[in-house]
Curated annotation (Swiss-Prot):
Residue stretches of biased makeup (Basic and acidic residues): 31-41, 69-86
GO biological process: mRNA processing; RNA splicing
Region of interest (Disordered), ranges: 1-100
Subunit-structure text: Part of a tri-snRNP complex.
Stretches with biased composition (Basic residues): 1-30, 42-62
Protein name per its UniProtKB record: U4/U6.U5 small nuclear ribonucleoprotein 27 kDa protein
Gene name tied to this protein: snrnp27
């Protein structure tokens, strides 16, 4: 790993005037100034999260409602509460026959005396809530032995 022993050409001494050194100094300063300007520009650009679409001033909407609106909303809430009467469980004498004291207490509290299943029975209020579980046959995509080879997009399956 030695260096080649070729001769270097003789260096030429050249007289430099002071004006060229001043020019060089001035160019260096300008370069530094432009670099710092670019750096500042880059920094300011990266700090701003996003630019608004329109340059016209925007009005900021406050998240809180105006006092008048809040009052209206409270009134509406009160009306809703008044409209819904508290459900009073009607217990007839027929329901009481053959029940223990605990079951009677439970009927007074909750409105039912025993825990029965309601599967398959129609109950009022349950008409609105329903779901159907439909199982469909599985559709498979053909990956191999297809026209166009592997690089072709797969067929759409809905």
């Amino acid at each position: 790993m030695g260096r080649s022993r070729s001769r270097t050409p003789p260096r030429r001494e050249r007289r430099r005037s002071r004006s060229s050194s001043r020019d060089r100094e001035r160019r260096r300063r300008e370069r530094e100034r432009s670099r710092s300007r670019d750096r500042d520009r880059r920094r300011s650009r990266s700090r701003s999260p996003h630019r608004r679409r329109s340059r016209s001033p925007r009005r900021h909407r406050s998240s809180s409602l105006s006092p008048l609106r809040q009052k209206d909303r409270r009134d509406d809430d009160r009306k809703d509460v008044k409209e819904k009467p508290a459900k009073v469980h009607q217990i007839s004498a027929e329901d009481m026959q053959g029940k223990t004291e605990e079951e009677i207490e439970m009927m007074k509290l909750m409105g039912f005396g025993s825990f029965e299943t309601s599967k398959g029975k129609k109950k009022d209020g349950s008409i609105k809530a329903f779901a159907v579980n439909v199982s469909q046959k599985r559709k498979y995509r053909q990956y191999m032995n297809r026209k166009g080879g592997f690089n072709r997009p797969l067929d759409f399956i809905a």
